[in-house]
Design a protein with these regions (language model features):
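Thiol-based oxidoreductase modules, predominantly thioredoxin-like and allied folds used
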Residues: 45, 68-81
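N-terminal leader/targeting and pre-domain segments
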Residues: 18-37, 120-121
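Sec-dependent N-terminal signal peptides
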Residues: 4-13
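Typically the conserved alpha-helix immediately C-terminal to a functionally engaged Cys/Sec
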Residues: 52-66
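Short active-site neighborhood of thiol/selenol oxidoreductases, capturing the structured segment around
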Residues: 35-48
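Non-catalytic, surface beta->alpha helical segment in thiol-disulfide oxidoreductase systems
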Residues: 98-123
Length: 123
C-alpha cells in the first residue's frame, strides 16, 4: 500500500511543479504598446497539465530572447476575458500579430523549427 502511494507521489509531484512554471504574462496595455512600437507580438494559450503548452512556452520563451523585435505573452485559456478577446477556444494556440493584425494562428504546434519559421515570416 505505501509503495503505491510513493509511486503516485513520485508521478504527481513533477507534474504539479511543472504546472506552476506556467503563468499568465498577457497584459492588454503591454500588448498594445508592443504593437505601437512595431514589434511582432506572439501570444500563446495554455492550461494546467498541458504538455504541448509547456513545450510551446519553452520554444517561445527562447524565441523571445533570440529575436530583438519580438514580444511574447502567454495566458491561461480558462481566462474567458482574454480567450474571448482573441477568439481562442483551445489551449496550445499560438497567435502572431504584426502591424496590429493577426497574421498567423496555429493550434498544437510544438516543433521549434516550424514555430521559428512562422515567426521569421513576420520579423
Amino acid at each position: 500500500m505505501s509503495k503505491n502511494i510513493l509511486i503516485i507521489l513520485f508521478v504527481l509531484i513533477p507534474f504539479n511543479s511543472f504546472a506552476e512554471d506556467k503563468k499568465t504574462t498577457f497584459n492588454e496595455k503591454l500588448f498594445k504598446n508592443a504593437q505601437l512600437e512595431g514589434k511582432v507580438v506572439v501570444v500563446s494559450s495554455w492550461i494546467k497539465y498541458c504538455s504541448s503548452c509547456a513545450s510551446q512556452m519553452k520554444v517561445l520563451n527562447k524565441a523571445n530572447k533570440e529575436f530583438d523585435n519580438l514580444e511574447y505573452f502567454a495566458f491561461d485559456v480558462t481566462n474567458e476575458e482574454i480567450s474571448n478577446l482573441f477568439k481562442v477556444e483551445y489551449q496550445s494556440t499560438i497567435l502572431i500579430f504584426k502591424d496590429n493584425k493577426e497574421v498567423y494562428r496555429s493550434i498544437g504546434e510544438t516543433n521549434k523549427k516550424e514555430i521559428y519559421k512562422a515567426i521569421n515570416k513576420f520579423i
